[in-house]
Amino acid sequence: MAKDIRVLLYYKYVPIENAEKFAADHLAFCKSIGLKGRILVADEGINGTVSGDYETTQKYMDYVHSLPGMEDLWFKIDEENEQAFKKMFVRYKKEIVHLGLEDNDFDNDINPLETTGAYLSPKEFKEALLDEDTVVLDTRNDYEYDLGHFRGAIRPDIRNFRELPQWVRDNKEKFMDKRVVVYCTGGVRCEKFSGWMVREGYKDVGQLHGGIATYGKDPEVQGELWDGKMYVFDERISVDINHVDPVVIGKDWFDGTPCERYVNCGNPECNRRILTSEENEDKYLRGCSHECRVHPRNRYVAENGLSQAEVVERLAVIGESLETLVAQ
């Protein structure tokens, strides 16, 4: 059965004059053709994911390719049955990828047009995965890795991308004398991060060109050596990558059983992304810890209209009480 919706994932590092006005004009065009999605515009370039029917997405690609400096912009296309977004957002930001270098005394930000790692095709990246002398580093957030990753890839002990440079410096002895290849969803983060590694003095740095999204569509590798699913930042939440021997590697936060369903912790001050079944979400009030379960603003409790007596009853089932809440 034909799928009616196309999802476009793309980015391009290219200087954009008057980027704030560009963002406003871009939003107006997207709305005029009925496109949905999320786009970041900065002085350094553009990064977005959008969805629509065939005609709408074709109009959008033609429009982008008509813009100065974007004639060769690479769209990665998924075909889906439903829209991946409900609304259309185009926002101006200082950077399309925030590595946090200037915030953390790491000198100036990286310009990928000047410094970046060597591009690896899916076939070359697969060879790197099988090479014992090559270190493969996942540059995504922890919850993205936990849902799916390349076999043997290192999981940095970080919560978000901005923490990665410091983590690499703290673990420098593991990488400095080895070949290092990095990967991310579509390539935009790796362009900047691999450039930073080159600037740090790493001699042999590579990156998966086009990211995981391209690897999964390559007719030769067919996503092999990828385990689990790829996390995406839209209504789909995840997509398949391995078309050879797929496996589930995600584990339920509460009981460790196989799981690929993500929710945000019910505590708005925590908001951690956790994998869990609907049954365990109900059982644990969508809280990743006791403190989050008994938090006064627990969203699960509010959304389901649970009384305090009902909360106490749920907590008792898992051997907990409201004592922490009372003490706050």
Swiss-Prot record:
An example Gene Ontology molecular-function term: oxidoreductase activity, acting on paired donors, with incorporation or reduction of molecular oxygen
InterPro entries the record matches: Rhodanese-like_dom, Rhodanese-like_dom_sf, Rhodanese_C, TrhO, TRHO_N
Keyword tRNA processing recorded: yes
Keywords of the record: Oxidoreductase, tRNA processing
Biological processes, Gene Ontology terms: tRNA modification
UniProt-annotated catalytic positions: C184
Name of the top EC class for this enzyme: oxidoreductase
Record-given protein name: tRNA uridine(34) hydroxylase
